[in-house]
Amino acid sequence: MNTLTAVCSRGGNIIACPHGAIGIDQEMIDYLTRPEDTAKHASLLGSMIAFDLHKEFGIPACIYDAIGTDEMQPIARVTGLPEIPRFTVGHTLNTRAMAIKCAEEVLKKPFNECTFIVAHLGGGSSIRLYHKGVNIDCVNDDEGNFSPERGGGCSGKELVKLCFKEFSEGAGEKTVMKKIHGNGGLKAHLGTTDAIEVEKRIEAGDKYAKVVYDAMAYRVAKDIGTLSVPVAGKVDRIILTGGIAYSKYLTSQIAEKVDWIAPVEMMPGEYEMEALAGGALRVLRGEEELQDFAEIKASAVDRIRICEGVEPYTVPEN
């Protein structure tokens, strides 16, 4: 290979951005590297490398389906605490890519004419509802099901008690956050994040490993059922993807609980590199627009506003 036409990277946690391609410029890099504006994530490095290649070779550079992609409908954002609205963050790149692939190869229909529930099952798991091309609702990795590393949703009252207990014993916010987001789920119960090891324990007769692992499948299935409600159960396909979707033990349990909603497609693994290449190619062909970061930042508040005249509790920095 001696010609490079464009470069496309995973996107960092740009708050409330739409799906698709966003051009990388100095303003984006400045935003992504300011700790007060965005959370630390490995994908930040990709954006910086892509921008360096853009400057060196004069080729287009973009991010695609960033982890901060948030297109949730206003009604889905409301919680009982105005200070804590709901938002979307996480596995947009792989879940949207798998939904597009399923639409094209299985249903033979345009993606924006279909409705999918896509469960990304990995170290952290999230579930997305794609309706007519838009991710209108989700279950984030800290809201519902637990996973190998995440604690998932739990009693708010008990969580408050746990936080105060940890603080009284000298722990700080980072320690408590790590307990929930990194050391929760299978790791907390079984001391490992390796699903293969857990299944071997189950085969060897470990009853506790079985009930915890089965509970993880149960919670995923419940969340899939939850996301069928906003579209009145009119779902074209349920897709199980991510690294743990290779587990027939786990996916069979999930499928048997949700296949009454829609047929279940097993699409294990991740399709992220192909998704980045496909996104860049669609931009080069003129099939998708290369969006401007400054415009996205300027309109971010409107995208996460619950109601006209009501300011979001969390306002993106301009």
Annotate each PLM feature:
Residues 1-42, 68-77:
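Short beta-strand-loop/turn "lid" adjacent to the catalytic site in phosphate-handling enzymes
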Residues 1-5, 105-109, 223-236:
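Phosphate/pyrophosphate-binding loops at sites that engage ATP/ADP/AMP, CoA/4′-phosphopantetheine
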Residues 7-9, 60-66, 117-119, 137-139, ...:
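General beta-strand structural signal in soluble alpha/beta enzymes
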Residues 47-51, 63, 78, 83-115, ...:
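Glycine-rich phosphate-binding loop plus the immediately following alpha-helix
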Residues 172, 178, 182-233:
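Adenine-nucleotide phosphate-binding core of ATP-dependent small-molecule kinases
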Residues 235-254:
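Glycine-rich phosphate-binding loops at beta-strand->alpha-helix junctions
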Residues 248, 252-278:
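Conserved phosphate-binding/catalytic loops in two-lobed NTP-binding clefts
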Residues 266-318:
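Structural signal for terminal/edge beta-strands and the immediately following C-terminal loop/tail
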